[in-house]
């Protein structure tokens, strides 16, 4: 969509800004300089601040810039709010926060929920992998960055501020706080879109660098079209790292942001610091090049010519630095992610974390750097601990996971030749030559093989493979958004849209067993809508209630209950009630009460798992059922039996303490402010107000989650929590299967019965089970030893007494043996004793040929002529033959 209006601001008229159009990119921009011809943005304008910063303001760290920004906006009436996590657990469309506005989408931006303050200011760590392939190369791109921002939310009945004030704030911040001359600042008109919203914007440019973007958001993006929002939102983004780079004027953004860390890494690895003038010139030219037009390899040659150096020499200087820049950026981003609960894996946010770790590793390998990645990460964690204390708190977990990932990656690389060979052969069979981009994606996603490694392996087989310069960006783009499953509904929404919202009695009183209601609608003779119901509708991993509806015409059995929009639909069998009639509903209380124990038990268990295994534990799925329920959690290895026992003890301690369970409905902002985003253990709750389930007293709650299920009043009602099984169901996901209440008691009793039965078989009691098993194992070991001895004697006897016929200089023997291990032993002994022996072992249609030194090639060839199917090595063959044994012997005789 084109911009709907010329962007202007009162400050431009007041201060004499001139609106111009860039002859190169055709964009309009505002400037104080009559002689400025181009827009001031890359690639139209080269960097003019490298080695020549536009200000002499005294700032020594990112922290200084951040504090200047936040304090400036606090002084101008903005509330400073705490940064959000980088994992967007309050959203169901994306995994990671890509900008500060993500914190407020979709609830605040849609008008459903008020903002935490208005106006507000924040410095939000953000992650974008859109340009991951450019990181380390361009001199300016990052995957992780802090977006400093000020936001204002204008409602139809409440105006805060809009274009004029926003532009004035930006002008004053850059000139007054940072000391940048007014004539150095250009405001370029543009359009911005992200996170489902859009709006016109100003890009704030200084000497070729975009330092901030001022978005005037008033659209929602629906089906590719812009629809006006009820709100007008000021969405600004000031790049903390870019502004610090602008002030410092270093050759690259990495030298400014990660300077102390890079110095330590260079010292540790023995990598010299590059010539500053060369890196500065290279960075300026790299910044002007479009990687979609000019390949990276070609870019080196062009830049080398421009700065008057040899292309090979430039590569040797720059490439090791690129690897260090990638390491610096990726290690910080990965640290943020893991500290926020992301476990590297093959799916979701874990996929992106693994991608960054492996890209950092690959870069170091290509640069010839030999050092444990975990050691280099640790150097960075020590630098990050003051600005990001949560990263330092997660240090041991981060280092353990990085170490595990490096070991996995090195194992993956060993498989490359065989995997690539198979892929090439498969393509050849399908009439396809070589490997294309999609093949490279498949090999990465399925086997973890980076494209450079695939290309090397293919080259050794005489096949050239082109590696796209944007390969990792392509991978990331396919994994940054959450997949939304399509919700199936029992009946069409249109058939119930006119009905009032169903009153949810199961929320008003979870212990209600019977109720009276009026039938509002019957659809297709089996779907019943009531004005109110105590039947719980399936949701949040809790199955629907069952029971009956009694009415004047008989009894209808309720077999399922589902939500369709704002109404609850009962699926019934039997005597269907008439519309307008009165019914008495009876919930299957024994089943419902068991599910309530399972649901409250689930909350107790996941908190116990989190307290034992660590704060990185997040729910990845759950299903409450009878007699067993399951909960899937993010964890990188199978818990030990000792850890599982500790989890079980902790959970049952909560049961024994008989803690109160509170259910309260709270405004979303209030709940998030009080409890944090741990609320969303069970997933996103799409509502202005959320239902909060708290286990334990207010001053010391054991667990708090947003939840729509039915719960007990006290934990003592659970009775018992028993873990049945723990297993890894996917990379980075562990499943706990458990049971509660009477079902847990029944399960324990069954275990006791089995233990007693097993002990009795060994002649003991269940209390003596361990000793009985030890005794039986010892007997079994002795019996196995004797069996091996007798098997050796038997094999020796068979080998000694083989009836072999002479065939020229060879000897031929055919025996029938079903025991494959015995046959191998006989063959080993017999052929060792007689190298000229050809031993044929037949077991049904299976035929195996052993020799001590005789070439079986001619034998196999002869046998194929009579129907043998199989093959083998020089002295061994195996296959299938269904014909006559005498014909088989005759064919072998001819071959010998």
From Swiss-Prot:
Example of a GO cellular component annotation carried by this entry: cytoplasm
Q: Which of this chain's residues are annotated to bind Zn(2+)?
A: 599, 603, 707, 711
> Could you tell me which SMART domains the record lists for this protein?
tRNA_SAD
Cofactor binding summary note: Binds 1 zinc ion per subunit.
Record keywords: Aminoacyl-tRNA synthetase, ATP-binding, Cytoplasm, Ligase, Metal-binding, Nucleotide-binding, Protein biosynthesis, RNA-binding, tRNA-binding, Zinc
The Enzyme Commission number assigned here is 6.1.1.7
The record's Gene Ontology biological-process terms are: alanyl-tRNA aminoacylation
Gene3D superfamilies, A to Z: 2.40.30.130, 3.10.310.40, Bira Bifunctional Protein, Domain 2 (3.30.930.10), Threonyl-trna Synthetase, Chain A, domain 2 (3.30.980.10)
| Keyword match Nucleotide-binding | yes
Class of enzymatic activity (EC top level): ligase
Q: Per its database record, what is this protein's job?
A: Catalyzes the attachment of alanine to tRNA(Ala) in a two-step reaction: alanine is first activated by ATP to form Ala-AMP and then transferred to the acceptor end of tRNA(Ala). Also edits incorrectly charged Ser-tRNA(Ala) and Gly-tRNA(Ala) via its editing domain.
Q: What is known of its domains?
A: Consists of three domains; the N-terminal catalytic domain, the editing domain and the C-terminal C-Ala domain. The editing domain removes incorrectly charged amino acids, while the C-Ala domain, along with tRNA(Ala), serves as a bridge to cooperatively bring together the editing and aminoacylation centers thus stimulating deacylation of misacylated tRNAs.
- Please give the NCBIfam families that the UniProt record associates with this protein: A-tRNA_syn_arch, alaS
- This protein's name: Alanine--tRNA ligase
């Amino acid at each position: 969509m084109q911009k709907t209006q010329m962007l202007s601001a009162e400050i431009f008229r007041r201060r004499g800004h001139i609106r111009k159009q860039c002859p190169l990119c055709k964009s309009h921009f505002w400037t104080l300089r009559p002689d400025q011809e181009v827009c001031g943005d890359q690639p139209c304008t080269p960097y003019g601040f490298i080695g020549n910063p536009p200000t002499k303001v005294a700032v020594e760290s990112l922290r200084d810039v951040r504090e200047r920004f936040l304090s400036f906006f606090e002084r101008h009436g903005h509330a400073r709010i705490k940064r959000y996590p980088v994992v967007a657990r309050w959203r169901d469309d994306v995994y990671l926060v890509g900008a500060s506005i993500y914190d407020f989408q979709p609830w605040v931006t849609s008008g459903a929920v008020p903002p935490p303050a208005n106006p507000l200011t924040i410095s939000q760590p953000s992650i974008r992998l859109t340009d991951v392939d450019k990181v380390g190369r361009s001199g300016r791109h990052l995957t992780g960055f802090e977006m400093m921002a000020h936001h204002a939310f204008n409602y139809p009945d409440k105006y805060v501020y809009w274009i004029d004030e926003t532009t004035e704030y930006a002008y004053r911040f850059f000139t007054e706080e940072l000391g940048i001359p007014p004539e150095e600042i250009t405001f370029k008109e543009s359009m911005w879109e992200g996170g489902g919203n859009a709006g016109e914007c100003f890009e704030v440019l200084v000497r070729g660098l975009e330092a901030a973007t001022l978005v005037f958001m008033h659209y929602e993006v629906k089906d590719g079209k812009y629809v006006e929002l009820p709100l007008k939102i000021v969405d600004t983004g000031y790049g903390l790292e870019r502004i610090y780079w602008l002030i410092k004027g270093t050759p690259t953004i990495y030298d400014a942001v990660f300077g102390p860390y890079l110095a330590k890494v260079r010292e540790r690895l023995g990598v010299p610091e590059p010539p500053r003038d060369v890196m500065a010139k290279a960075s300026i030219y790299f910044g002007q090049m479009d990687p979609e037009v000019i390949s990276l390899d070609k870019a080196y040659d062009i830049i080398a010519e421009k700065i008057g150096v040899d292309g090979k020499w430039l590569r040797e200087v720059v490439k090791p630095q690129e690897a260090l820049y990638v390491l610096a950026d990726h290690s910080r981003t990965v640290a943020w992610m893991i500290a926020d609960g992301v476990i590297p894996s093959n799916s979701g946010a874990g996929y992106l974390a693994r991608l960054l770790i492996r890209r950092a590793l690959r870069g170091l390998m290509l640069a010839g750097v030999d050092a444990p990645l975990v050691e280099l990460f640790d150097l960075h964690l020590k630098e990050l601990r003051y600005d990001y204390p949560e990263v330092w708190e997660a240090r041991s977990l981060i280092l353990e996971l990085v170490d595990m990932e490096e070991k996995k990656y090195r194992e993956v690389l060993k498989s490359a030749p065989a995997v690539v060979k198979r892929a090439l052969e498969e393509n050849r069979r399908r009439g396809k030559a070589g490997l294309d981009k999609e093949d490279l994606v498949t090999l990465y996603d399925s086997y973890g093989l980076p494209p450079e490694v695939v290309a090397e392996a293919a080259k050794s087989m005489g096949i050239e493979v082109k590696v796209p310069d944007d390969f990792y960006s392509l991978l990331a783009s396919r994994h940054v958004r959450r997949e939304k499953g399509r919700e199936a509904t029992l009946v069409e929404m249109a058939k119930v849209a006119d009905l009032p919202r169903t009153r949810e009695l199961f929320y008003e009183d979870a212990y209600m067993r019977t109720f009276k209601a009026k039938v509002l609608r019957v659809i297709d003779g089996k779907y019943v809508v009531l004005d109110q119901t105590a039947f719980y509708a399936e949701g949040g991993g809790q199955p629907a209630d069952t029971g009956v509806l009694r009415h004047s015409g008989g009894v209808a059995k309720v077999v399922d209950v589902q939500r369709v929009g704002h109404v609850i639909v009962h699926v019934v069998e039997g005597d269907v009630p008439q519309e307008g009639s009165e019914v008495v509903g009876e919930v299957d209380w024994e089943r419902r009460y068991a599910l309530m124990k399972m649901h409250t038990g689930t909350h107790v268990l996941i908190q116990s798992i989190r307290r034992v295994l660590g704060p990185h534990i997040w729910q990845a799925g759950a299903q409450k059922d009878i007699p067993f329920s399951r909960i899937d959690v993010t964890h990188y290895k199978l818990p030990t039996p000792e850890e599982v026992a500790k989890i079980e003890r902790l959970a049952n301690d909560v049961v024994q303490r008989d803690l109160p369970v509170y259910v309260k409905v709270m405004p979303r902002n209030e709940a998030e402010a009080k409890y944090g985003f741990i609320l969303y253990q069970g997933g996103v709750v799409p509502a202005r107000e959320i239902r909060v389930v708290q286990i334990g007293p207010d001053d010391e709650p054991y667990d708090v989650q947003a939840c729509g299920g039915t719960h007990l009043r006290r934990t003592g009602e659970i009775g018992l929590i028993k873990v049945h099984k723990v297993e890894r169901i996917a990379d980075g996901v562990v499943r706990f299967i458990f049971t509660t209440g009477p079902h847990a008691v029944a399960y324990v009793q069954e275990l006791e019965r089995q233990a007693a039965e097993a002990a009795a078989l060994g002649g003991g009691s269940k209390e003596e089970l361990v000793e009985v098993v030890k005794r039986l194992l010892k007997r079994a070991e002795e019996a196995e030893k004797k069996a091996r001895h007798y098997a050796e004697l038997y094999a020796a006897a068979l080998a000694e007494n083989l009836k072999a016929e002479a065939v020229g200089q060879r000897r031929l023997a055919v025996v029938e043996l079903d025991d494959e291990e015995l046959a191998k032993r006989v063959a080993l002994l017999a052929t060792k004793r007689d190298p000229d022996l050809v031993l044929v072992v037949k077991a049904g249609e299976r035929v195996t040929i052993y020799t001590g030194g005789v070439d079986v090639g001619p034998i196999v060839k002869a046998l194929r002529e009579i129907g043998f199917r199989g093959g083998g090595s020089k002295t061994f063959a195996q296959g299938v033959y269904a014909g006559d044994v005498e014909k088989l012997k005759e064919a072998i005789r001819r071959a010998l």
